[in-house]
Amino acid sequence: MNTKQIFTAAVGLFLFGTAFAQPKVVSPVIGEKEVTFSMYAPAAREVTVHGSWMNPDDNCYGTPVWAPDIEVVKMKKNKEGVWSCSVPVPSSDLWTYNFYVDGVYVLDPSNKFVQWDGTRELSVLLIEGDVTKNFTGATRHGNIQLVWYDSPTLGQERRMMVYTPYGYETCNKPYPVLYLLHGGMCDETTWDNMAQATAILDNRIQKGEAEPMIVVMPNGNPSQNAAPYKLFANEDRNESLTRERNAYVNSLVKDVIPYVENHYRVIPDKAHRAVSGLSMGGAHTLAVTAAYPDVFDYICPMGCGGNRNEDFLKGIRGIKEAGYKLYWHAAGTADFAYPGAQVLDEILTENGMDHTFYTKNGGHTWSNWRIFLDTLLPLLFK
């Protein structure tokens, strides 16, 4: 070997050895009483961790790192450059967290369990228990597809996620359909990604606690045909929301439902259609059932509310006149939408409409919406 080759080989061996000299980091480590988070960042000046369990009454968009009252736990660096901290084991749930390295928001590089909520990525901490019993463990799984369909109403090709239950491909049975609508700044993948929707469906159906059903999760952003999410231009956002929402609501009935009923083995009648959604999707649920009261027999908005303007009241009266099987709405008591949900409850009561107002502690969060979906599924198509 000549001198240049020897030098090149030596550099390669040095880099190879350096890479493997980096300490092995496992994170998170869940013990009996504490969870330990760790990250290799030898050049960092400060590393902290912020988790959703620190403020369960927060909203799903999270507390920005620059907020003066954000709760974080400071991590300490050892001589190998590994930062670590331990916190008490949170209650049973699927929690999310991020590290802040010198103020920069990052994932836990040692944790492969990552969620995407339409605007950001989050590392996941799953604490098993009663709350999470339907998030894992199923042995018979349904299938999910990302499906493109034509939407003449919105003038574009659009995409939706479709869940078919275990056994769909091997039988001739027709199924009822749940149309499951996402919230603001999310997309057609978010119900499955953030709420573990298909895992909950698999578990509930396998246990015989929910009817086997097809679940359709469309993209609810009229100016976007598929994930990833693109924000509306600021100058157009406020004036376009009502117009775009109305167009999307029309497209659900005129484009999405016909596509599903032409391409999947479904029972194509009101008694076998349900609609539910969270936040913006809850508003879409209220709007589509008011505009088309003869389409859905199961009406299940979450994390949203009503109002007393005449158009809204007229829509509620139309639903009552058309008839329905189940009106079930839900909100966390710390949700900023909770006052509006109380108004909706009052309006339904005043109109003599049989309904359920399901509440629990917590805010405008995925922790609540997962539980709401898990609670709702056994009530559908009974």
Question: Model regions: which residues?
Answer:
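Short beta-strand segments of immunoglobulin-like
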Residues: 25-28
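Bacterial Sec-dependent N-terminal signal peptides
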Residues: 1-23
